[in-house]
Swiss-Prot record:
Organism name: Gallus gallus (Chicken)
Extent of Polar residues compositional bias: 205-224, 625-637
Cellular localization per UniProt: Nucleus
Gene: HDAC4
Bias kind Acidic residues: ranges: 560-571
Name of the featured protein: Histone deacetylase 4
Pfam families on file: HDAC4_Gln, Hist_deacetyl
Physiological role: Responsible for the deacetylation of lysine residues on the N-terminal part of the core histones (H2A, H2B, H3 and H4). Histone deacetylation gives a tag for epigenetic repression and plays an important role in transcriptional regulation, cell cycle progression and developmental events. Histone deacetylases act via the formation of large multiprotein complexes.
InterPro entries named in the record: HDAC4/5/7/9, His_deacetylse, His_deacetylse_dom, His_deacetylse_dom_sf, Hist_deacetylase_Gln_rich_N, Ureohydrolase_dom_sf
Residue stretches of biased makeup (Basic and acidic residues): 132-162, 233-244, 258-273, 509-527
Amino acid sequence: MSSQSHPDGLSGRDQPVELLNPPRVNHMPSSVDVSTALPLQVAPTSVPMDLRLDHQFPMPVTEPTLREQQLQQELLALKQKQQIQRQILIAEFQRQHEQLSRQHEAQLHEHIKQQEMLAMKHQQELLEHQRKLEQHRQEQELEKQHREQKLQQLKNKEKGKESAVASTEVKMKLQEFVLNKKKALAHRNLNHCISSDPRFWYGKTQHSSLDQSSPPQSGVSGTYNHPVLGMYDSKDDFPLRKTASEPNLKLRSRLKQKVAERRSSPLLRRKDGPVVTALKKRPLDVTDSACNSAPGSGPSSPNNSSNNISAENGITGSVTSIQAETSLAHRLVNREGSVTQLPLYTSPSLPNITLGLPATGPSSGGSAQQDAERLAIPALQQRISLFPGTHLTPYLSTTTLERDGGTAHNPLLQHMVLLEQPTAQTPLVTGLPLHAQSLVGGERVSPSIHKLRQHRPLGRTQSAPLPQNAQALQQLVIQQQHQQFLEKHKQQFQQQQLHINKIISKPNEPARQHESHPEETEEELREHQALLEEPYSDRVSSQKEVPGLANMVQVKQEPIESDEEEAEPQQELESGQRQAEQELLFRQQALLLEQQRIHQLRNYQASLEAAGMPVSFGGHRPLSRAQSSPASATFPMSVQEPPTKPRFTTGLVYDTLMLKHQCTCGNTNSHPEHAGRIQSIWSRLQETGLRGKCECIRGRKATLEELQTVHSEAHTLLYGTNPLNRQKLDSKKLLGSLTSMFVRLPCGGVGVDSDTIWNEVHSSGAARLAVGCVIELVFKVATGELKNGFAVVRPPGHHAEESTPMGFCYFNSVAIAAKLLQQRLNVSKILIVDWDVHHGNGTQQAFYNDPNVLYISLHRYDDGNFFPGSGAPDEVGTGAGVGFNVNMAFTGGLDPPMGDTEYLTAFRTVVMPIANEFAPDVVLVSSGFDAVEGHPTPLGGYNLSAKCFGYLTKQLMGLAGGRVVLALEGGHDLTAICDASEACVSALLGNELDPLPEKVLQQRANANAVHSMEKVIEIHSKYWHSLQRYASTVGYSLVEAQKCENEEAETVTAMASLSVGVKPAEKRPDDEPMEEEPPL
């Protein structure tokens, strides 16, 4: 049927309606015609019926559209919701950002305010200091003017007043002096301190123009009356003397001077002006007393009669000018301007108590002055040697600057002395009297006299143990600083005793040239050159014992000439009285000295007992004890044995001078790298007994030439010199001014950055000593004198680059030692392992293109976000050195931190395979312990145990025939570094190590460590083929790796046994026919 449209709007496909079309309606009866209207009524109802019952085609057309519209509406709603949420988040972020910005700005303002307050406080302190200095200077000026006025009044006095005749005041003073002399001497024996008030020295000297030439009214020798160091009050001043203006006094004084110059006994020289100079009679103050020593100047040392007489008669008796605020040796200047030495050998490893002060003019009686000063210095040295905790140098060096510098450097010297006083002078002065003549026996003094400019006996090994009482010496001292001083003191004291016996037997023996030891640097030889310029025979003309004092003191005596008969009988009587009184005084003070020595030894014994150490002095002879008789030869005979060689064991090197490298602020809490680090390690090694099993060697300062093997000349000169010897350098060699290289730290000190502090006096010496100690130890191990070694040194060095100090480091000790091994010993292969938690950027820079030095560093890297930022795994070297720079750089932060498992795995899979393939001749270790548990995040953050480092050390000992040297680098937690050092030294000694915990053996390395190791193996496997074998075992635990290696070893063994078993079976059938061939 066709689907035609109809007027009623129905389509032809509507079959029910199609039956009622009009043509058919016309043939129907009329009675039914009414039904024609039915379609009109039925049609409206039929349409919904069709939709409901038959066809539903219109619905699929309308529903997708609606759903699409609904989906679009929902999408729009979601987008609007997301937009709203995004706007809310942005608004919240902006709000928080603004809040943080405000907080940060407030913190900045607060920080700036604090800095301003600190700056203002510092400025106020400076102003206050300047005000005090100005006030002090004004007081000095007033005192000086007052003295000049007094002097001018005396010069301009009327002719009618008395001039040459002693006044009533003078007579009263003389009488008071005689009555109080004995009381003053006894008082001076019991009081051993110096007044810090400079006016204390000026009390009774304003009348010096009236008290210069009268003979003394007491019979006490002037050479002993006035100690160089001791209690010095107004009553102890030189006796007031009459001026030498009358002819009879002039004649008498000149006669006395002539006799005194030729008199045999120095005890009779009371009035010998040129012999006893102002320096000798002046007390050694540590405060300022700057003045000239012209006759009548008052505040300077009281001049004796001969000086004034010589000046008045046209003979210039120049007296040395003494600058303000100078230390001990500045007062002990001889006639050439050089400084008198202490009798010990010149060791660069002990602190210097003085910097020397040049004299302004020659003194007319220099030889006798030197003689008395030489007797004074041993007395000081032997008294000081009993004081614990006092860091004293065994020598007073004389430099070219001191001889030729004149007064131009005096302000610099004063500045150096001011910097030195808080640590050196205070313990030195307290309780130590120093007399113009020695208080000990001749045998104890004479070695010091002759030792000053004689060479040391050849053939002594500096690191050798003492021939006698070495163990007793170690038990005697519990404080390591004082113990080291006593050990060195004992070695040199024995040698001096041996040497002085030869000198005594040959008093007129000509001088011999100074022999330098290998440890002495060229700088030290230059410092001692001044002492060599004057012949020894000029200083020691003859030796003769003084009757009655042979067992007390030995002094230089001049030949007796016939002119001695010109002396008046009265002088002889006075001399005898003075000699008897002098002898009595000597005995009293010798007894006092012995009592003090016994008191010190008892203190040591008590400290040893408190520490639980055995106390056994037995036959040990105290180092500072004098021989009781010149004829005693038992002690010198014992040191004639040849020095023993060092034991072939682990070597240790340490020096207390490195303790002086510390910030001037004095607060160690704000400076992680402080002196307590190495002091604690040394104490731990001593407490555990490890130090006694090792061989302790003597360190030295590295020379400037040695430093320049790694560092630039400007860097070496800037950080390897102190202000005193820096003045001798060419200013053009120093790049820029010194002040531009340092900054003021928040603590008030000075440094090159916030971490690397600088002490103008001690830092250069400590840094050079650290390098020299490492060099000495490395060379002794490399040459086979020692088995291995551990250097307890500071400051560290592996961050120091060619021209840049950083990270607490100034000179790269390990790199310098490696360079010198190549240059001096032609060592072809050197392995440097750096297990400090920070990358050794300085060491890497020094050998980045050297194929003969393999540098392996294990450090925290964190993609360059941990100090110093270098040490990426792809930094493999350059040029010929490609592949010889291995950075085992751990990345991943502290989630979780690296521990024993990770480091042991790195050693097993990276370090040891490469090291074995390299096959080094010497192994050097930059042994930083800041990866040990206990260090804060900025300084490490890892959780290694101390015993782990013992196992790492033990593995390295399998290389290079055991020639392994560890040098301390970082590590700032005292407990951690002490434990780790103990573990390493124990491993070096070959002791059985404590087993690792089972957890460490079973645990696998964390994912970050595995990824870091795989990356290193991937980079370096093309340079080191042995890494490929361990690439698959990085994820194994130690137990699993050991099991795998055992299985491989068993497999190899089985294969080898199979190959060995087949060969005999094949040979026997071959052999048997050959034996049977002849019968056939």
